[in-house]
């Protein structure tokens, strides 16, 4: 019970800043109706409860199941089994990812939803296979990233304009609440089964690699079909005048999302059952814990998605529309940055990432460090997205230089930060981006008379890119700080020798120096 209480407190810390920003906006420059505000407040409550249940359930079920599957296939001597199982897992977990379904609904009628979802799922399957092979054979992550992003940039020159933003957004939304816990745990499991000193570093980067697959797959789809999305249909905001209306609206939302979440969980559950039948990897107590965890995930994700879609989608669109009407849309930039800094903290997958980072780095890299890097990166990304909506700037003028910087930084930061940064990019662009930020951008774009597919779409892609840079900058600072500590330690030892201290005195002084922060963390 105390664990769930801690989860509630964590969720409150994440969601309340967003709620306060929206409330301040609603009583100043973005007036909301009483009905819309009521839906939003209930949505905040749903997000807090849903996130708490989801993160608790993911720790009980998705993570241990993924770890066990990863360690099992990682221990296999048959490469074709590792490759085939990884490919199937990638498709199975992605095909019903809620974030992907939300994006597909936003694209419009010109592109069939199921065609887009299947294309993205196959892309994830192929690149999960590549990611696992990288861990098994010890391939260098940065060179793989450089090669495949180069392929994506070349393909982008042959795409219709509207498909460029869609392709990069697809890479962002794929790594959502269903895929991240499972895929990252598989990476950790495969890495744990691999002997060698670098297995900790190799466990990161798997989500980042899986984000490239949908980008390239959707680009190929665009080149073949040569069509563009028509954009999202207008949001129909329910008329809410009484508390009864709000309750009925949310009950309708729950009814819609229960089957969606059940379908999203079903492939993972079926795969887990088959895995248990074949391997007998879990005992009875562990199986009961897994089942309880899956129930938590189901209930939590249903509540979370309902709160996001009913309470946050219309609010986001209203805020975007109103802000774009002030002073040529200039206020949209600072407000977007402020929202971006806090909204990433409300992503369920971010908690999973932070927890794994702390565990796999043995506490050397704290969740706070990762969270700060994510927040700064997302704030910058949404500021650039708002600038694009106002000016109509082509996304490739930001994407190409941004990834050149990100890939260039990978040569100067510790290896573990490279993998964490690319994982962070995929994790940051989750449910809240699809359910709140994308409607905000489309509302602003409509108000300014822009093209939704070329100007509003692409915000998720920028959100996925910016943390890659900001986390690596944190890694660069970590590296420089560690070097400084080493230099101070060496200078201290030289001083002891110069003044004729005995060996035991030198050791005691060196230990004291480390205790005060002068030692190396490397």
Walk through the language-model features, giving the residues of each.
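Hydrophobic alpha-helical transmembrane segments in multi-pass integral membrane proteins
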Residues: 158-166, 217-226, 304-311, 383-384, ...
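Alpha-helical transmembrane segments
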Residues: 128, 132-136, 163, 188-202, ...
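Transmembrane helix-loop boundary segments of multi-pass membrane transporters
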Residues: 38-39, 57, 105-117, 134-150, ...
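Structural signature of hydrophobic alpha-helical transmembrane segments
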Residues: 40-52, 111-122, 169-183, 235-236, ...
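Helix-loop-helix junctions within the multi-pass membrane cores of secondary transporters/permeases
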Residues: 70-72, 79-151, 329-410
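Small-residue-rich segments of transmembrane alpha-helices in multi-pass membrane proteins
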Residues: 18-22, 50, 78-86, 147-158, ...
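Signature of multi-pass transmembrane helix bundles
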Residues: 1-56, 71-72, 76, 171, ...
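Transmembrane alpha-helix boundary signature
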Residues: 31, 55-67, 92-103, 161-165, ...
């Amino acid at each position: 019970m105390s664990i769930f209480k801690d989860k509630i407190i964590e969720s409150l810390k994440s969601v309340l800043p967003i709620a306060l920003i929206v409330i301040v906006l609603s009583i100043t420059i973005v007036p909301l109706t009483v009905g819309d505000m009521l839906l939003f407040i209930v949505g905040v409550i749903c997000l807090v409860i849903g996130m708490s249940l989801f993160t608790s359930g993911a720790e009980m079920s998705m993570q241990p199941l993924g770890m066990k599957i990863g360690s099992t296939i990682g221990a296999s001597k048959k490469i074709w089994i590792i490759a085939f199982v990884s490919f199937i897992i990638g498709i199975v977990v992605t095909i019903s990812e809620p974030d992907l379904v939300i994006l597909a609904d936003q694209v419009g009628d010109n592109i069939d939803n199921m065609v887009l979802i299947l294309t993205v799922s196959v892309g994830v399957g192929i690149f999960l296979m590549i990611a696992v092979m990288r861990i098994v054979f010890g391939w260098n992550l940065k060179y793989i990233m450089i090669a495949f992003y180069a392929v994506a940039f070349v393909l982008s020159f042959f795409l219709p304009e509207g498909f460029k933003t869609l392709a990069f957004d697809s890479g962002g939304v794929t790594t959502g609440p269903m895929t991240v816990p499972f895929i990252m745990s598989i990476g950790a499991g495969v890495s744990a089964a691999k002997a060698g000193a670098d297995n900790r570093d190799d466990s990161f980067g798997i989500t980042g690699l899986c984000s490239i697959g949908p980008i390239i797959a959707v680009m190929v789809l665009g080149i073949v079909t040569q069509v563009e999305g028509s954009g999202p249909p207008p949001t129909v905001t329910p008329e809410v005048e009484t508390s009864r209306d709000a309750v009925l609206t949310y009950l309708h939302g729950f009814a819609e999302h229960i089957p969606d979440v059940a379908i999203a969980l079903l492939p993972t559950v079926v795969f887990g059952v088959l895995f248990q039948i074949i391997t007998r990897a879990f005992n009875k107590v562990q199986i009961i814990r897994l089942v309880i965890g899956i129930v938590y995930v189901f209930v939590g994700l249903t509540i979370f998605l309902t709160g996001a879609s009913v309470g946050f989608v219309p609010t986001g669109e209203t805020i975007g529309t109103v802000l774009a009407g002030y002073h040529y849309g200039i206020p949209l930039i600072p407000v977007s940055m402020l929202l971006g800094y806090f909204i990433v903290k409300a992503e369920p997958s971010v908690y999973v990432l932070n927890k794994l980072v702390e565990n796999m780095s043995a506490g050397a890299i704290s969740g706070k460090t990762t969270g700060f890097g994510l927040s700064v990166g997302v704030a910058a990304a949404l500021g650039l997205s708002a600038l694009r909506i106002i000016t109509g700037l082509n996304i490739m003028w930001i994407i190409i230089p941004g990834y050149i910087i990100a890939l260039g930084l990978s040569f100067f930061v510790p290896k573990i930060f490279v993998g964490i940064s690319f994982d962070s990019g995929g994790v940051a662009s989750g449910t809240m981006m699809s359910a709140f930020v994308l409607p905000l951008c489309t509302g602003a774009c409509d108000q300014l008379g822009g093209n939704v597919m070329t100007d509003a779409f692409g915000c998720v892609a920028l959100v996925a890119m910016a943390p890659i840079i900001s986390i690596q900058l944190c890694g660069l600072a970590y590296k420089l700080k560690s070097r400084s500590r080493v230099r101070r330690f060496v200078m201290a030892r030289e001083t002891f020798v110069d003044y004729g201290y005995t060996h035991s005195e030198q050791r005691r002084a060196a230990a004291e120096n480390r205790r005060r922060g002068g030692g190396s963390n490397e």
